[in-house]
UniProtKB/Swiss-Prot annotation:
Main localization of the protein described in the UniProt heading: nucleus
Keywords: Nucleus, Transcription, Transcription regulation
Compartment annotation: Nucleus, Nucleolus
The organism of origin for this protein: Candida tropicalis (strain ATCC MYA-3404 / T1) (Yeast)
Biological function: Involved in ribosome biogenesis, probably through modulation of rDNA transcription.
Protein name stated in the entry: Regulator of rDNA transcription 14
GO cellular component terms, semicolon-separated: nucleolus
Pfam families hit by this protein: RRT14
Name of the gene: RRT14
Family statement: Belongs to the RRT14 family.
Top-level taxonomic group: Eukaryota
Length: 185
């Protein structure tokens, strides 16, 4: 038997109206065996399921797009990485990828707890000290050379003041070209 109603809600509303009419005419109580959902509730239920379906479909599509993007990026990275000759755009892409990944790591590795952060800093500094090469001899040589240079600089300045050595650009006994005595007073 085909129904002449356009939706379940309109059929329910019509049946409910007829039942109320008969109960008023026959002076009987309306049977309460059926649930008491009205047309608006049925519309809302139907609409919410459609909204949920659309929302779920949108989530599924977005997830698929993200997977596709990630896969394409992975393929591009592997292609560029395995290339023998990398051109300028490939190098730029790789450096951009490195910066992006470093930023992700830095943003995700922030520690909120002060004590844990302090302990992490101590452990990382100990590891860096162990990994760092020992530069004892060279450092001593560099420091020794710096002291030698200081002696040389002192000797040079003394000779300049005595007038033994002339410095390029200055004439002994004369003031520089742009020198004003009124400026120094």
């Amino acid at each position: 038997m085909s129904s002449s109603f356009s939706s379940d809600a309109s059929q329910y509303q019509a049946e409910n109206t007829v039942n109320k009419l008969f109960s008023n005419i026959l002076h009987t109580n309306i049977s309460t065996t059926k649930s008491t959902t009205n047309a608006n509730q049925l519309f809302a239920q139907h609409g919410s399921s459609v909204k949920k379906n659309k929302k779920n479909e949108a989530k599924r599509i977005k997830k698929n797009e993200e997977r596709t993007k990630a896969f394409n990026k992975f393929v591009k990275y592997n292609y560029i990485k395995n290339k023998e000759n990398k051109n300028e755009s490939d190098k730029k892409y790789l450096s951009k990828l490195v910066r992006k990944n470093v930023n992700k790591l830095n943003s995700s590795s922030k520690i909120d707890d002060f004590e844990i952060n302090e302990e992490f800093n101590i452990v990382s500094s100990e590891l860096l000290d162990q990994i760092k090469p020992k530069n004892g001899k060279r450092l001593r040589k560099k420091l020794f050379r710096v002291n030698e240079n200081d002696e040389r600089a002192k000797e040079f300045n003394e000779k300049l003041q005595k007038g033994v050595i002339s410095y390029p650009g200055l004439t002994p006994g004369l003031a520089p070209v742009d020198y004003n005595e009124s400026d120094s007073e």
